[in-house]
């Protein structure tokens, strides 16, 4: 999609070589009033389908959080921010497909590249904010539920979305390679230098998340040991509970790394002459991160599951008993 030159993503080829600025093989200028639109390739269709699934999943999460008054706690605000970002990413993929292969508008395609850059940045930023919130809820357990927590949540969300908006506007307003394809990176029309900056920012975020989750593991192990001693539980019970908690954190961080690390590394190593196939193969898992985020951060929550069951049964959600849950449960 956004990695095709000109008005489309279809300067893709299975091997390396010079960049083709047209969407298909060179053709004569059209003699009629109609504009020749490129034909989508299999990878383009797969990404469009992925965008549709991402949009549907996250639209459901947004609808649940907005439509359920009980979901106004800071942790649900952060999950809602993540869902909105992933929803924009899914819609951006679908609309970019339409802009390239149905409308043929280079200007619309460029704007949607900015939307995708903003959405994916906001998604990663929201994941970092959720990690920070989880850590603080355990580190400052006694003072977590206060007005300060709400204020801090809004500040984090503001920083995430302002930063994402800035990074999304950069390729639209100035920093792109539409006028100089030799400066392009693996994703058109983002320049190589721009992608390097984004990759470095990702590694910084990933490093912070890794450090915070390591601290969370230490706190969880210490708390589990203290509870086991107070309740005179067997050591086996302590280790089982601790191992389960650490396994959950490993799944959360591992899914994030598996989805984004291949594409980020490829952005650093590749350039405009790199095989287009590798761009698709590394970018597709990155879109899957927006597909699994609702499962990890929303649908696993028991209160969200209650609302889903109520919706499926056409029942009112106003009488559903919700229990107080900490961010580490989300």
UniProtKB/Swiss-Prot annotation:
Extracellular side: 1-42, 99-110, 174-198, 273-277
Keyword Ubl conjugation on entry: no
GO cellular component, one term: plasma membrane
GO MF, any single term: G protein-coupled receptor activity
PROSITE patterns assigned to the protein according to its UniProt record, in alphabetical order: G_PROTEIN_RECEP_F1_1, G_PROTEIN_RECEP_F1_2
Descriptive protein name: G-protein coupled receptor 3
Positions where Phosphoserine occurs in the chain: 324, 326, 328
Effect of residue 134 to A: Loss of plasma membrane localization
Topology feature Cytoplasmic, residues: 63-74, 133-153, 218-245, 300-330
Disrupted-gene phenotype: Mice are fertile but display progressive reduction in litter size despite a stable age-independent alteration of the meiotic pause, characterized by premature resumption of meiosis in about one-third of antral follicles in mutant females regardless of age. Aging mutant mice had severe reduction of fertility, manifested by an increasing number of nondeveloping early embryos upon spontaneous ovulation and massive amounts of fragmented oocytes after superovulation.
Tissue/organ expression: Expressed in both the forebrain and hindbrain, with the highest level in habenula. Lower level expression in the testis. Expressed in several metabolically active peripheral tissues, although at lower levels than in the central nervous system (CNS).
Membrane topology: Multi-pass membrane protein
Compartment(s) of residence: Cell membrane
Family of the protein in this entry: Belongs to the G-protein coupled receptor 1 family.
Keywords for the protein's UniProt record, in alphabetical order: Cell membrane, G-protein coupled receptor, Glycoprotein, Lipoprotein, Membrane, Palmitate, Phosphoprotein, Receptor, Transducer, Transmembrane, Transmembrane helix
Membrane-crossing residue ranges in chain numbering: 43-62, 75-98, 111-132, 154-173, 199-217, 246-272, 278-299
Organism: Mus musculus
Lipidated sites in chain (S-palmitoyl cysteine): 313
Role: Constitutively active G-protein coupled receptor that maintains high 3'-5'-cyclic adenosine monophosphate (cAMP) levels that a plays a role in serveral processes including meiotic arrest in oocytes or neuronal development via activation of numerous intracellular signaling pathways. Acts as an essential activator of thermogenic adipocytes and drives thermogenesis via its intrinsic G(s)-coupling activity without the requirement of a ligand. Has a potential role in modulating a number of brain functions, including behavioral responses to stress, amyloid-beta peptide generation in neurons.
One BP term from GO: regulation of meiotic nuclear division
Glycosylation, residue list: 20
């Amino acid at each position: 999609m956004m990695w095709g030159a000109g008005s489309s993503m279809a300067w893709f080829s299975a091997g390396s070589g010079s960049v083709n600025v047209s969407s298909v093989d060179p053709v004569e200028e059209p003699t009629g009033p109609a504009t020749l639109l490129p034909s989508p390739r299999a990878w383009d269709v797969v990404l469009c389908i992925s965008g549709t699934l991402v949009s549907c999943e996250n639209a459901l999460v947004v609808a649940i959080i907005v439509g359920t008054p009980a979901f106004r706690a800071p942790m649900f605000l952060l999950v809602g921010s993540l869902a909105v970002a992933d929803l924009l990413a899914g819609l951006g993929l679908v609309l970019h497909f339409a802009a390239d292969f149905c409308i043929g508008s280079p200007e619309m395609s460029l704007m949607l590249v900015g939307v995708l850059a903003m959405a994916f940045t906001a998604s990663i930023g929201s994941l970092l904010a959720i990690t920070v919130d989880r850590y603080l809820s355990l580190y400052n357990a006694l003072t977590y539920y206060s007005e300060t927590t709400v204020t801090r949540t809004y500040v984090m969300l503001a920083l995430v979305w302002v930063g994402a908006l800035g990074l999304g506007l950069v390729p639209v307003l100035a920093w792109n390679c539409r006028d100089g394809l030799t400066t392009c990176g693996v994703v058109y029309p983002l320049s190589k230098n721009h992608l390097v900056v984004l990759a470095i920012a990702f590694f910084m975020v990933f490093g912070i998340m890794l450090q915070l989750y390591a601290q969370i593991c230490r706190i969880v192990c210490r708390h589990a040991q203290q509870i086991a001693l107070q309740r005179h539980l067997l050591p086996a019970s302590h280790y089982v509970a601790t191992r389960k908690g650490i396994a959950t954190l490993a799944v959360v961080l591992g899914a994030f790394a598996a989805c984004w690390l291949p594409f980020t590394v490829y952005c650093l190593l590749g350039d405009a002459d790199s095989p287009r196939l590798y761009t698709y193969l590394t970018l597709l898992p990155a879109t899957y991160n927006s597909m699994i985020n609702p499962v990890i951060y929303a649908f696993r929550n028991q209160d969200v599951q209650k609302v889903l069951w109520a919706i499926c049964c056409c029942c009112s959600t106003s009488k559903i008993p919700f229990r107080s849950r900490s961010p580490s449960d989300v």
